[in-house]
């Protein structure tokens, strides 16, 4: 009949939140590895022999992250001591997380400001 059908396909990313959740899950289960030479081939094996070998889908790392809680100029880490935090927040600005479980001091401050109130 002379008619034809066109089908177009493309790949699309899942919602950003879903990608973030998958990456966080992989990060939490990441395995520290070391490089070993087996014959003429270099392979990555778990640093702890009690861990199972990783798959192509697993997240692995060679070097541990620095401790961002403590002052370490060699690694460019300023630490968290003396920073202001949000006492009620459970996010990264929250005192429990930012202060690395070391505790924190609270100050109550009263701020008096002029406002453009009309009565």
From Swiss-Prot:
Segments traversing the membrane: none
Presence of the UniProt keyword Metal-binding in the record: no
Pfam family, one: wnt
Sugar attachment sites: 86
Signal sequence segment: none
Main location: secreted
Superkingdom of source: Eukaryota
A Gene Ontology term for the protein's cellular component: extracellular space
Keywords: Developmental protein, Disulfide bond, Extracellular matrix, Glycoprotein, Lipoprotein, Secreted, Wnt signaling pathway
InterPro entries hit by this protein: Wnt (IPR005817), Wnt_C (IPR043158)
Post-translational modification: Palmitoleoylation is required for efficient binding to frizzled receptors. Depalmitoleoylation leads to Wnt signaling pathway inhibition.
A GO term, aspect molecular function: cytokine activity
Biological processes per GO annotation: canonical Wnt signaling pathway; cell fate commitment; neuron differentiation
Sites of O-palmitoleoyl serine lipidation: 1
Localization of this protein: Secreted, Extracellular space, Extracellular matrix
Disulfide bond positions: 69-100, 85-95
Family: Belongs to the Wnt family.
Known role: Ligand for members of the frizzled family of seven transmembrane receptors. Plays an important role in embryonic development.
Name assigned to this protein: Protein Wnt-4
């Amino acid at each position: 009949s002379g008619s034809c059908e066109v089908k177009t396909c493309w790949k699309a990313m899942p919602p950003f939140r879903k990608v973030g959740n998958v990456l966080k899950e992989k990060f939490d289960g990441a395995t520290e590895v070391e490089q070993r030479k087996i014959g003429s081939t270099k392979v990555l094996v778990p640093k702890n022999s009690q861990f199972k070998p990783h798959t192509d889908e697993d997240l692995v790392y060679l070097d541990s992250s620095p401790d961002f809680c403590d002052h370490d100029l060699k690694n460019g880490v300023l630490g968290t001591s003396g920073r202001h935090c949000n006492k009620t927040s459970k996010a990264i600005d929250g005192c429990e997380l930012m202060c690395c479980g070391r505790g924190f001091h609270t100050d109550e401050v009263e701020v008096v400001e002029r406002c453009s109130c009309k009565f």
